Amino acid sequence: MSAQESCLSLIKYFLFVFNLFFFVLGSLIFCFGIWILIDKTSFVSFVGLAFVPLQIWSKVLAISGIFTMGIALLGCVGALKELRCLLGLYFGMLLLLFATQITLGILISTQRAQLERSLRDVVEKTIQKYGTNPEETAAEESWDYVQFQLRCCGWHYPQDWFQVLILRGNGSEAHRVPCSCYNLSATNDSTILDKVILPQLSRLGHLARSRHSADICAVPAESHIYREGCAQGLQKWLHNNLISIVGICLGVGLLELGFMTLSIFLCRNLDHVYNRLARYR
């Protein structure tokens, strides 16, 4: 076996093994997405997180899993069977994915102000219509998750929620906000949250906790909710995690470039004379 044949054989099995790994990874991601769709309650208990945007995550995970499995399958079969058509299709899919990522990066950099305005409009619309439209459940769950994770409330400030009609309290009642705004560390009275949620849970029955955005908490004092708006919270999160985000994007891009280079190299250097059909006889 010549040095060139040894190199091609090494590249072939390298592509096969790594794409097999990504195929298994895609299968697991797809299974998690299906799990969420079938049994949301057990998934929430498993991950141990509150205010998880289940509807969005189930679709994202399922689609991502199918896409990952599809690309990995092309790489596995194309490399193992030395099929130029599959290797070329594998290269094209990776190139399209890489170009899409570059385009998104450029758009985010050049249209940042417009994206911020669009995001603000979407969030303000979600806040104003909170709890009034069953079709907006996914958006409400997502915003609850953002508030819970970033420890913030509202877009500009917590008072954004006080303008929502169904949450507004009268002179004798405390204001109400989504429970994702509630700051448990601000008070030692851990029963306040339960006093508000439990009556709702009793009415929901077996559907209790299936939609966390339905949880509304009374706030006896503004000190019991996060004081920072999520606009500032998002800016802080991006600033603190900028290096990690850039590192992950660069890592994914380099990985895609590496697989593209290996696949096109293998595709161009396969023996033109060898009859691929002979091995199937």
From Swiss-Prot:
Residues 39-59, 112-241 are extracellular. Keywords: Cell membrane, Glycoprotein, Membrane, Transmembrane, Transmembrane helix. GO terms for biological process: defense response to protozoan; negative regulation of myeloid dendritic cell activation; negative regulation of T cell proliferation; positive regulation of immunoglobulin production; regulation of defense response to virus; regulation of humoral immune response; T cell proliferation. Interacts with SCIMP. Interacts with SOCS3. Interacts with DECTIN1/CLEC7A. The keyword Signal does not apply. Tyrosine phosphorylated; leading to activation of downstream signaling pathways. InterPro entries: Tetraspanin/Peripherin (IPR018499), Tetraspanin_animals (IPR000301), Tetraspanin_CS (IPR018503), Tetraspanin_EC2_sf (IPR008952). It is found in: Cell membrane. It is a multi-pass membrane protein. B-lymphocytes. Antigen presenting cells. The gene is CD37. The chain crosses the membrane at residues 18-38, 60-74, 86-111, 242-266. This is Leukocyte antigen CD37. It comes from the Eukaryota. Glycans are attached at N170, N183, N188. Disulfide bonds: none annotated. Belongs to the tetraspanin (TM4SF) family.
